[in-house]
Swiss-Prot record:
Disulfide bonds join C37-C77, C39-C67, C60-C78. InterPro entries: Myo_ane_neurotoxin_sf. Keywords: Cleavage on pair of basic residues, Disulfide bond, Ion channel impairing toxin, Nematocyst, Neurotoxin, Secreted, Signal, Toxin, Voltage-gated sodium channel impairing toxin. This is Delta-actitoxin-Avd1e 1.
Amino acid sequence: MMNRLLVFLMLGAAFMLVVSAIDQDANEDINKRGIPCLCDSDGPSVRGNTLSGIIWLAGCPSGWHNCKKHGPTIGWCCKQ
């Protein structure tokens, strides 16, 4: 009985370690890149065009500029 409990705890710990590592990597990617948006210079449509802007909720930070005349409903579409 004790061996089964120990095996169960070890498998649970290994699972939690893997899940926490995957989640941490996903958060780092979002922090680095943000949510992409379509700048006016990208073209009229999302299809086939790269999304070169990033949505910022509290305005564009220093070194960035608003790249869309009519921005997204929430936040600003900014480009470096």
